[in-house]
Structures are given as C-alpha cells and as structure tokens.
C-alpha cells in the first residue's frame, strides 16, 4: 500500500480547488468577490491550490457537491443559527457564512444526517429521525471516558426537494437506516442499515426498489461511496475480532451506540464481491472518497496522532 501525506488539520473548511480553480470567492451577503485567503494552507500542504473557510461555529459536516458542481449540501448544529441538533443546509459555491445564515432545507424536526444530491440537482436524499419525534433525540455521554456515537433506530432515508419538502420515504424497515450516498452514474444508492441486527451496507435503486445486502460481517460498515464509474464501493468498518472486542461492540450496539475510534478502510465491487481490507493503520481511518481517476482513495486519519488528534488527510492507491 502506497500512502501519500496531505497534511491538514480538519476544521470546518472546504477545498474549493477540487472542483473550481478560479482564484476568487463570493461574499455571501453582497455578492462581491475577493482573493482567496491562502493563509489557511500550511507550507507543507503542497497539494492544495486554494482553500476557503465556509462556516464559523458549530459542528459542520458531510458537505457534498451537486452533480452540476454548482451547490453544496451540508449538515450543521450551529446554535447561532438556532439549531439544537443537525439540520440540512444549502449553499452556492463561493458562499461563506461568517455573518449570514444559509437556507435550511430540512424540516427542522428531529435530527438529520448525511444528505446527498440526486442527479437532477433539484432533490436530495438524507437520513432523519423526525418520524420518531419532533424533538432532537438525546445525545449519548462518553462511556468510561470513551467516545461513542448514537445509532438512532428512528433514522429513515427520505427524498426531499431543495425547499425542504419531503417527496418520498425510501426506507421503512425497523431500525437505523442512514448514511446514503448516490452513484455518479445516478442509478444506485448505498446506505447503512440495522435491519439484519448488525450495521451492514445495502444498495437500492434511487427510487428505493431492488434493495440488496452488500456486506455481512460483524462490525460497523458505513460511510460508503461509489467509484467514479459506479462499479466499486469504498467504506470504513470496525470489524471487531477478539472476544473482548466483539462483546464490547455488541453490548454497545444493544444500547444503540458504536465506538468509532478503531476503523479501517475496505473496498469491494458494487455488488459486494471481491471485498478486501485496504488499510491496516490503527486508530480511526475515516471519510474515504475516490479520486476522480478511480485509482486512488482520499481519506482522513489520526493514525499518526498520539492523543487521537489531529486528523489529517491522506491519499493511497486502491491496490
């Protein structure tokens, strides 16, 4: 495995150069443009052409491009925007939100996660707990000092337009259904589900039909993305192996929790065949995404961090 270091501390920034090489940015309120602030790029970060900070405050995550590269959808719990837990927001490329608030495009009910544009650029899929209650579900506390994530059984996957109107519910099975992303071919969705009693990957058509199970090994399989040609999937998984690891994983899962601190990357064909482990680095290896060539993977990791932080970006070959 050939690894390449792309040093960057992960805070709420977006590398616009991935899609847009223009050396300017728009003011979200006035529409005026000004030069990129290159002070965000450290001298060692030779792979970045430009970088712009988009959000200021709160937790802002899961930011994904529209198919036409003109807009970005993301989730935020920014209290300055009136949020108690994650909701979905929309922005045009070049917008920043230091002194303004982007339009919210989810219902404002429950908690939401992992939005992704559909090919028409007029609608998107996302996970939401709102059918289980209008309020934000309770956030878990650390267990014995360990960081844990909630796996709310009220999460289902929905389709909505960019005004926030839900147009379709794609999942109805009991338990957690979330983390949906769409194939660049525009024909399939991959998502994580608890419908078998464990957190496995599934695919379906973009209309919710033809659901197929992709993974079937014990562990939290999630955060999956298609390759540019739609033939492969990259994802991260915990895959506990020892009796102690298995017991801890299963005990937490019974409480609707996971501990996402030991995750490695896996790759397989879109039908689940030819599954193989891609990294063996230790700690948390996260957010894998295919390079446009389809031959490399970009991901975030803290494997070199002594105390679990900071996270940095890396690139590896798929072989």
Question: What residues fall within each predicted segment?
Answer:
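Short loop/turn segments that connect beta-strands within beta-propeller blades
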Residues: 93-96, 161-165, 205-209, 269-273, ...
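Hydrophobic beta-strand positions that form the internal "hydrophobic ladder"
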Residues: 72-73, 124, 189, 233, ...
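Residue-level detector of Asp-centered blade-edge/turn motifs that repeat once per structural unit
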Residues: 67-68, 119-120, 184-185, 228-229, ...
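C-terminal motif of bacterial Sec signal peptides marking the signal peptidase cleavage site
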Residues: 16-17
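A flexible loop/linker signature enriched in serine peptidases of the S9 family
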Residues: 56-59, 76-88, 106-112, 127-156, ...
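Predominantly a core beta-strand signature of beta-propeller blades
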Residues: 50-53, 98-103, 147, 165-168, ...
